[in-house]
Amino acid sequence: MSNTLTYVIPQLLAQGLMALREEAITARLVNRAYEPLAGQKGSSIDVPIPSAITARAVTAAVTMPANVDSSPTRVVITLDQWWEAPFQMSDKDLLEAAGGIMPMQASEAIKALANKMDAYLLGFYLKVPNYSGVAGTTPFVSTVAEYTDARLRLNKTLAPMTDRRVLLNPEAEANALKLALFSQADQRGDQGGVINGQIGRKLGADWFMNQNIPVHAGGSAGGTTTLSATMTVGQAILSIGACTPTDGTFAVGDTLKVGTGSTAVYFTVKTAATATASVAAVTVDVNAVSTASAGAAIEHPKGSQAINLMFHRDAFAFATRPLESSSQGLGNIISSAIDPVTGLTLRLEVSRQYKQTTFSYDILAGAQLIRPELACRILG
């Protein structure tokens, strides 16, 4: 295998440029409290979730009342994401290439791993049921209604008021920055938006832009869909009628809103489904915790939709553990470093082969959606 270094030979390259990078910062915004020690591929972290406790009245008596059992649950973070981004250069390449080629290629390698981890983390949106906004319509055209609706969902699910984040794609952020509430200093409260173009902390959340925001390919079923049969507590399959078109589809990760107003219940679609004669049996990710009568309205955002997010830090957990720097490197140079943009812990291994050197950055990580109720999609 040979390299093509036409564009890094000194006579053709006046100045090297570092890699252009996305704002792949999701890992900085989620819970990172589970990274104390180095780990190996396949190891896991148990995250305990406390069980609810009901207060009871105290009545003096000779005997004590019965003890109340508690049943905490757990969510497992498996460290199974092991990725590398290598590049190699021969001795001839190193002699001929401009002095800046090494940091340029290293920057590209780190960028590749950062984007991979960012996409991995953002991919957990598939199990986030709450949503605001309209599918296919970029939010914040004239108001912050999409944000306040998302904030309402987090407030109703008891999300802590601190450590709330908003992640927007470039189009949504551009719309938001046009609003006087964010761009004009007399309404914003400071000059941050005017000077550096960042929204910062506003309306009880920290706002960030991320070019890696995913686009979800939603199913085609729309119209005024309804429950065609009563929804009961613990039910995992919803019977949905009045689908348009009559053979409309529901894709994995689609959201469903059953009912209206303060009693509405949100679900995500677990298994793809297709309607037959306008009726579909749709398996949802979390069993129903309330009832709804047949005929209850169902809202199904359909088609292509950007998945901007509002979430509390503890909705997601992420752990990246440094792969050990071997004391028996067998001639290889192995060291660990932290990417200043994303905060990811990477390992660099430099290995000598026949007349060439291979540079390989790798990462071992894992993540999990710990509390889906603490996140909300802002559709675009």
Kindly give the residue locations of the regions a language model identified.
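N-terminal "assembly arms/tails" that initiate or stabilize quaternary assembly
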Residues: 1-79, 375
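Surface-exposed molecular-recognition determinants
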Residues: 3-19, 102, 147-149, 170, ...
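Signature of extracytoplasmic/envelope-associated structural regions
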Residues: 4, 108-137, 220-226, 242, ...
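Short, low-complexity, charged/polar segments at coil/turn and helix-coil boundaries
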Residues: 28-41, 46, 51-56, 144-181
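Long, contiguous amphipathic alpha-helices that act as assembly "spine/axial" helices in icosahedral shell
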Residues: 47, 75-146, 155-172, 197-207, ...
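Autoprocessing Asn-cyclization modules and mimics
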Residues: 141, 175, 181-294, 377-378
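Internal mixed-charge
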Residues: 201, 205-214, 268-375
